[in-house]
Amino acid sequence: EILRCLVGSEMCIRDRYEEIVKKAGEMKIPVFINPRPEDGISLSMQIGLMSVRDTDACLFTVSDQPWLEADTVVALTELFENEKKGMACIRWNGKTGNPCIFGQKYYEELMEISGDKGGKKIIKKHPEDVAYLQIRNARELQDADEPDVFTAGNLR
């Protein structure tokens, strides 16, 4: 469902998500593979940014948030367009998470990040330039890094 929101976009994907690469290909979404995912999130961000460096903004998301709603992604992009801030993120009770949008003016700072770190440092550095989308359900922020997240008791 989230991929449908991204039609017309380009993606950088860690190589372990073959099913996402396949689905993106079926939907004609260009995919750029991170050949060294062990180098961390920053390399995936940089590969993605290099492929879209002439765009006005870039949305970063992760593929392990099974409760993230497509409507939330759409609302976030609309918020970014309407608020005219340099960044936009989703938030629940003060906790910021993915997806996040960064305007082109932050691309250089994003390219300087190293290791297994994302753009949170930049968000904290420029709080006056961030628009926040308050989400309705905290589960949208939850990562599914562990298999037990998908047990019957957790799928609500």
Positions of PLM-derived features:
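Hydrophobic residues at beta-strand termini and immediately following loops
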Residues: F32-N34, I90, L133, A144
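Conserved donor nucleotide-binding strand/loop of the catalytic core
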Residues: M27-D39
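Conserved beta-loop-beta/alpha segment of the NTase-like Rossmann-fold superfamily
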Residues: E38-Q104
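Short aromatic/basic micro-patch
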Residues: C5-L6, W67, I101, Y132, ...
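Single conserved hydrophobic/aromatic residue that forms the stacking wall/gate
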Residues: E1-I13
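Acidic helix N-cap motif at the loop->helix transition within catalytic regions
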Residues: E18-G25
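Short, structured coil segments at secondary-structure junctions
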Residues: V7-G8, E26-K28, Y106, H126
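Conserved alpha/beta core of the MobA/IspD/sugar-nucleotide pyrophosphorylase nucleotidyltransferase superfamily
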Residues: E108, E112-R156
